[in-house]
């Protein structure tokens, strides 16, 4: 599996961002709201015009079609959108183990998306993304709508999976506690730059 | 043709009905009187002018003048398409897309119908070419503007859905497929409805006009069927071309959704 590299990315207020994320490594990003965390993820996912480039292993962002890049480097937005009627239609393949690990059941696939709570949407958006077998993940506060217990449950499922599949992960997170649990490295956005913060004291 | 001659004073009589209606709405404080009168005056003036133009055109009958007339009609309908958009593409793209798709569909269907079906001599005889083109352009314009309006509106409203689908690695065409389908449906619904209701609920305007002008109903019906089919084809192809091109233009070469290319009309 390949690592994810950001080279001289410039988007919004952010300038000249360099970052290497190794396979299986989680790099946490934090910063005040409006500092450009989401836009940085969107730039890496190539969803908006930006300076610089990103690389997954030997493949450069601009060298393949947009959808091919995003088929490898998948972003999970803070607020997920749903377009089919049922949950199952959004999954590329049945994900019984993932659903069970997150406190759902086989029946969940037949649930109507209009009745999902924000917490359910957030967890199912992650399952939906992983059902398409990405090779790198960009997560925008994936536990923002979850309580403490559910958050821990999600981490217990996701972390081993990231390690097993050796996915490079950029994870936008808020809480210092969570960052200490997850991160290989942690960067705080300060103005136009990323400032590395110690993860464990 | 044995049309009963209609004199101008008889039209004045008909116009008094509109004036009476305007007076009623004025006294009922509906605030419609003024625009009703302006619209009625526009109808009279515009149609009188086009009557003069058509008389002259029919008298000359040369291909140049027919073509010039056709192009003028096309450009005006292109402007009309843009005027009906809530959001339009920046940089004249809406006008270009609307005009080109109407040109491709309405003009080719008109020429095809003239050459292969009606077969007048010469084939561009303005007596057939201009009314047919006018009817096709009018209807294609409605289809194109409804289709484009629906597409751009859903791109803005459903931006989250489209972008989330892109994030999951879908192509731009897949990510907006539902909205393209909706836009096509919106553009084609009027003609599908009027084909389905023709003769049962409504007597189409052209057929009514022909019968009033003295044509035998059987002939009027045949022409109406012809016109309905050509309108359906023209509207369908025109809307398809416009919606497909506009959808492509909503995404850039990296398949990103670019709602910043839209501006409030």
Annotated model-derived regions:
Chain A
Residues 137-141:
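Catalytic Walker B motif of ABC-type/P-loop ATPase nucleotide-binding domains
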Residues 72, 79-98:
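Q-loop/switch helix immediately C-terminal to the Walker
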Residues 172-174:
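H-loop/switch region of ABC-family ATPase nucleotide-binding domains
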Residues 60-74:
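ABC ATPase NBD coupling module
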Residues 112-116, 120:
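Conserved ABC ATPase signature
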Residues 126:
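Hydrophobic anchor residue at the start of the ABC signature
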Residues 45:
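Helix-to-loop junction immediately C-terminal to a conserved catalytic motif
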